[in-house]
């Protein structure tokens, strides 16, 4: 558990550097044969074909490339090569976040790859904006993450927030949780889809240098406990993919909140937002890229229904971690 949660901080990118805007199809003076120039000051300058170069300087701990587009378009990274010419997407492509309106690449997403100093190259399509964030400072012995909770309605979530804080503190991570802000009633029930206009408007209220948690009364179109805007979310980039949704209704039995489950869900989805995948997916064939997290193989599926449960995996295979593949919805009274 210690290695799992501290990995969050290795991947965390809350230090803004610089933003660049570009388009994959708007510069009419470019030609496809144009050679990309090395980005200066961390400003991405791809050519008309979407190919670009950027420099990672010595001392960089991690970096995150954002690509945004219209909500009905999925921006795509087709290549990311380190200074030695190694193509990271060959082995880590399945962990590159891709969704309509927003995609990203995070390095390191695995201990197999470091943000090596030197000239990196990339290729992207279907984007309207590109942005590069870098972390250049090491973590302190007791790192701190700023968290901003928002809530629709009058439920008291203070106990759940304390449970969430304790989950992180047991691994030496401090959560600086600010006072909960109350949302307007129009955000009481929203879509799970971060491209939905109402959801996007709500999430865009969040600051770019915090993890923004939105506790909503219910989803209009899903029965999830919660969901994050991405793995990772748009850390350092203010907008509609800069937050986590948590469904209060799904955590109630007989009208009462299950604070333990609510705190665990908040910690689970926050882990996704910071870049953590499930250690094992329920099919038992896909595992996260972090070496020190336990894997639960399909051979543990004792009832042969092709879906692993927490009981089948047990503590030995990571079922007791907050990032395990799923949490269980409570039974409604």
Annotate the PLM regions.
Residues 1-8:
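Bacterial N-terminal signal peptides that target proteins for export
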Residues 8-17:
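Bacterial N-terminal signal peptides
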Residues 16-45:
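Bacterial Sec-dependent N-terminal signal peptides
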Residues 45-90:
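Acidic, Ser/Thr/Pro-rich low-complexity intrinsically disordered segments
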Residues 83-211, 215-221:
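Propeptide-to-catalytic entry region of secreted or membrane-anchored zinc metalloproteases
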Residues 149, 199-284:
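Active-site-proximal segment of zinc-dependent metalloprotease catalytic domains
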Residues 280-298:
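Post-HEXXH active-site segment of zinc metalloproteases
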Residues 325-333:
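Conserved small/polar residues in nucleotide/adenosyl-binding loops
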């Amino acid at each position: 558990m210690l290695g799992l949660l501290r990995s969050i901080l290795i991947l965390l990118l809350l230090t803004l550097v610089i933003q660049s805007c570009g388009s994959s199809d708007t510069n009419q003076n470019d030609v496809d044969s144009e050679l990309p120039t090395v980005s200066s000051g961390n400003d991405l300058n791809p050519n008309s074909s979407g190919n670009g170069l950027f420099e990672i300087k010595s001392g960089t701990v991690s970096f995150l490339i954002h690509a945004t587009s219209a909500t009905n378009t999925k921006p795509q990274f087709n290549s990311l090569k380190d200074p030695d010419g190694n193509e990271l997407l060959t082995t880590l492509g399945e962990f590159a976040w891709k969704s309509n309106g927003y995609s990203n690449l995070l390095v390191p997403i695995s201990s197999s790859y470091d943000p090596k100093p030197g000239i990196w190259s990339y290729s992207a399509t279907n984007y309207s904006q590109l942005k590069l964030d870098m972390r250049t400072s090491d973590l302190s012995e007791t790192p701190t993450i700023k968290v901003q909770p928002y809530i629709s309605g009058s439920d008291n979530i203070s106990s759940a927030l304390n449970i969430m804080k304790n989950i992180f503190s047991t691994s030496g991570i401090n959560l600086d949780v600010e006072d909960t802000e109350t949302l307007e009633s129009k955000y009481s029930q929203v879509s799970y889809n971060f491209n939905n206009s109402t959801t996007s408007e709500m999430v865009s209220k969040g600051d770019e240098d915090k993890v923004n948690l939105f506790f909503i009364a219910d989803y209009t179109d899903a029965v999830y406990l919660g969901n994050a805007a991405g793995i990772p979310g748009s850390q350092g980039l203010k907008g509609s993919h800069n937050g986590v949704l948590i469904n209060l209704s799904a955590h109630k039995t007989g009208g009462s909140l299950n604070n333990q489950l609510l705190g665990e869900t908040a910690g689970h989805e926050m882990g996704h937002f910071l870049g953590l995948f499930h250690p094992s997916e329920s099919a038992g064939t896909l595992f996260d890229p972090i070496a020190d997290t336990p894997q639960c193989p399909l051979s543990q599926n004792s009832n042969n229904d092709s879906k692993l449960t927490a009981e089948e995996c047990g503590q030995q295979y990571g079922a007791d971690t907050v990032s395990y593949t799923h949490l269980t919805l409570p039974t409604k009274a």
